[in-house]
């Protein structure tokens, strides 16, 4: 998640995500999703690529819930992989970004699935692709990025628990065991 992705945007950010922390546990993973405004004249990925191709470079905007997080980097990678110049519009959280997408102020939004699922199910946002190894049971008609030839994007967000660097191994092991117990 942001812990690791932030370094790509801010290499002098003051920490090394590998050297400065001791991993304790992976807490959860969630799929990412690309959704579009319902007014975008596209029904699927190919239509969206055509739509973007007809616009001036930078005219199509994509929102994320912030700067330098995994969704921002996903949007930049998506833009690069399809050979288009999209404009990133960072928000202070996913909620305001989704509201503006549904309100027509933006064309695209890169988000985690839990944040956008209600908008998708209520037909207030149209899903384009999911970042996950397989199609989702909740959205079986939505292809994965890998199916669209964009396999570099095909992973979700992970939420992990870390401690300061050089944590003694016995404490790391205990924290991992307690975390597993609490999470089960």
Residue ranges of each PLM-predicted region?
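Short, electropositive, low-hydrophobicity segments enriched in small/polar residues
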Residues: 5, 69-73, 97, 108, ...
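Hinge/capping helix and adjacent helix->loop/strand transition within the periplasmic-binding protein
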Residues: 8-96, 145, 158-184
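Short, charged, surface-exposed secondary-structure boundary motifs
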Residues: 7, 97-100, 137-141
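Beta->alpha turn/N-cap motifs
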Residues: 1-2, 94, 111-116, 131-133, ...
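Short helices/loops that flank or line small-molecule/ion binding pockets
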Residues: 52-55, 76-81, 95-105, 109, ...
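Short beta-strand->loop
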Residues: 16-27, 63, 85-89, 107-108, ...
């Amino acid at each position: 998640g942001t812990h690791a992705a932030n370094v790509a945007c801010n290499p002098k950010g003051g920490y090394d995500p590998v050297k400065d922390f001791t991993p304790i546990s992976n807490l959860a993973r969630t799929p990412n999703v690309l959704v579009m405004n319902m007014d975008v004249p596209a029904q699927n990925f190919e239509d969206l690529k055509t739509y973007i191709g007809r616009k001036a470079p930078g005219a199509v905007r994509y929102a994320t819930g912030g700067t330098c997080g995994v969704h921002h980097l996903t949007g930049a990678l998506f833009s690069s992989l399809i050979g288009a110049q999209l404009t990133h519009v960072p928000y202070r959280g996913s909620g305001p970004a989704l509201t503006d997408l549904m309100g027509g102020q933006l064309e695209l939004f890169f988000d985690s699935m839990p944040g956008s699922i209600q908008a998708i199910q209520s037909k207030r946002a149209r899903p384009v692709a999911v970042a996950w190894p397989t199609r989702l049971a909740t959205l079986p008609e939505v292809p994965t990025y890998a199916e669209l030839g964009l396999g570099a994007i095909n992973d979700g967000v992970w939420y992990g628990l870390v401690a300061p660097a050089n944590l003694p191994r016995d404490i790391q092991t205990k924290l991992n065991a307690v975390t597993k117990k609490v999470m089960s």
